[in-house]
C-alpha cells in the first residue's frame, strides 16, 4: 500500500469512528428514560401526595431524559395491604406505607403504634432523627426493604358515630384499624372491636355503618372526607401516623452510584418539603372540619385524657419483648 493510500485509509477509519460515535450518542439521546413508579394510597393534596410530586419534579429536573417518575396516588396501582409485596416484585420502585404496615418485616417498628408513647410531633421527630430512629431505617434490609426516610402525617384522633369522651364510650364499637397487632390490642384494651380493613374502604365502611369509627390524622380525616360520615371526632392525640419511604434492595443496588446519590438527595429534599406541609396542615385541616359543621369535635380534659392513658398504656408491656425495652425507653426520652 502506497503512503497516499495509507493516509486515505486512516482518514476513512477516523471518519467512520466519528460517525459511529455520533450515531451512538444519538441513539443514547433517543433512548426512553428509565421509569420509576411511586405508588401510594392517599390523595395528592396530602403531605405524602405532595412529597411524591416534589420527588418527581426534582428527579426529572436533575436527571433530565434519564429517569421518569410516575406517581400513582389513591391506591390506583396497589392498596396498603399489597404495596410492599409489589415493591419486592419490582412492580413498583418506591412506596411510603404507614409505619404500621412493616410488622411482617420487623417487629421493632411496632414501636410507633404504641398508644400515648409520644406527646407531640416534636418528640416523634427527635426520636426519628436520633441514632435509634435512624437505625430502624435499616431494620428490614435482610428482608429486601431499604428505608430511606421518615415522612410525617401527624398525631391520630378518634372518630365515631357517637361521642368518645371516656374509654367506656368505645366499648362494643367497631373501629377500623390498619393491619397491626398493636393497634388491635389498643382497641381491645377499651373493649372495642378492631376491624382490619384497607384504607381505600374506610369511607364506605363508615358511610354504611359497617363500622362505628376509626383513628386517623386531621389531614386524612379531611382529605378523605371521613368527617362527612362521622358525627363525632375526639382530639385525643393518642398515637402517631407517620410513613417510611422505602425501596427494594434489588432496585436500589441496580442504580449507578452517581444516579443513586442524586435520587437520594432529591428524596431527602422532597421529604423535608412534605414534612413542612404536614406541620402546616394540622391546624388548617382541623379548622376546615370544624367550619364544615359536619362533625362535633370533643376536647378531652386532663382527667379524661388520663383515663384513656391508663386504659391503653398496658399495651406497652404486652409488646415490650418484641419491640425492645431499649427502643421504648429511647422513645419516652424524646418527650423530655
Curated annotation (Swiss-Prot):
CDD domains: PBP2_TRAP_SBP_like_1
UniProt KW keywords: Periplasm, Signal, Transport
Location within or outside the cell: Periplasm
Gene Ontology BP terms: C4-dicarboxylate transport; transmembrane transport
Quaternary structure (record): The complex comprises the extracytoplasmic solute receptor protein DctP, and the two transmembrane proteins DctQ and DctM.
Protein role: Part of the tripartite ATP-independent periplasmic (TRAP) transport system DctPQM involved in C4-dicarboxylates uptake. Required for the utilization of succinate, fumarate, L-malate and alpha-ketoglutarate. Binds succinate and malate.
One Gene Ontology term, aspect cellular component: outer membrane-bounded periplasmic space
Record keyword Signal present: yes
Entry binding sites for (S)-malate: 48, 101, 176, 216, 220, 243
Signal peptide start and end residues: 1-31
Protein name per Swiss-Prot or TrEMBL: C4-dicarboxylate-binding periplasmic protein DctP
Record organism: Shewanella loihica (strain ATCC BAA-1088 / PV-4)
Family: Belongs to the bacterial solute-binding protein 7 family.
Amino acid at each position: 500500500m502506497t503512503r497516499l493510500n495509507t493516509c486515505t485509509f486512516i482518514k476513512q477509519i477516523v471518519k467512520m469512528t466519528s460517525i459511529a460515535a455520533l450515531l451512538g450518542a444519538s441513539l443514547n439521546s433517543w433512548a426512553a428514560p428509565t421509569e420509576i413508579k411511586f405508588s401510594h394510597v392517599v390523595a395528592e393534596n396530602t403531605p405524602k401526595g405532595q412529597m411524591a410530586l416534589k420527588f418527581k419534579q426534582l428527579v426529572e429536573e436533575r436527571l433530565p431524559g434519564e429517569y421518569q417518575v410516575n406517581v400513582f396516588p389513591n391506591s390506583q396501582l396497589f392498596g396498603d395491604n399489597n404495596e410492599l409485596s409489589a415493591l419486592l416484585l419490582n412492580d413498583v420502585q418506591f412506596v411510603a406505607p404507614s409505619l404500621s404496615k412493616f410488622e411482617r418485616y420487623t417487629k421493632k417498628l411496632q414501636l410507633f403504634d404504641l398508644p400515648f408513647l409520644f406527646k407531640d410531633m416534636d418528640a416523634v421527630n427527635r426520636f426519628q432523627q436520633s441514632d435509634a430512629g435512624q437505625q430502624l431505617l435499616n431494620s428490614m434490609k435482610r428482608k429486601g426493604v431499604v428505608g430511606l426516610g421518615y415522612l410525617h402525617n401527624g398525631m391520630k384522633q378518634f372518630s365515631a358515630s357517637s361521642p368518645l369522651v371516656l374509654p367506656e364510650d368505645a366499648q362494643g364499637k367497631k373501629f377500623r384499624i390498619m393491619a397491626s397487632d398493636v393497634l388491635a390490642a389498643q382497641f381491645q384494651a377499651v373493649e372495642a372491636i378492631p376491624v382490619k380493613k384497607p384504607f381505600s374502604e374506610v369511607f364506605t365502611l363508615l358511610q354504611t355503618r359497617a363500622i362505628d369509627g376509626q383513628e386517623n390524622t386531621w389531614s386524612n380525616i379531611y382529605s378523605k372526607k371521613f368527617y362527612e360520615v362521622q358525627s363525632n371526632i375526639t382530639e385525643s392525640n393518642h398515637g402517631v401516623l407517620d410513613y417510611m419511604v422505602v425501596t427494594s434492595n434489588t432496585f436500589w443496588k441496580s442504580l449507578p452510584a452517581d444516579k443513586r446519590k442524586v435520587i437520594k438527595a432529591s428524596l431527602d429534599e422532597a421529604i423535608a418539603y412534605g414534612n413542612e406541609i404536614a406541620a402546616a396542615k394540622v391546624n388548617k385541616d382541623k379548622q376546615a372540619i370544624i367550619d364544615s359543621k359536619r362533625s362535633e369535635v370533643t376536647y378531652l380534659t386532663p382527667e379524661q385524657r388520663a383515663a384513656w392513658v391508663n386504659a391503653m398504656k398496658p399495651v406497652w408491656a404486652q409488646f415490650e419483648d418484641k419491640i425492645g425495652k431499649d427502643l421504648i425507653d429511647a422513645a419516652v426520652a424524646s418527650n423530655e
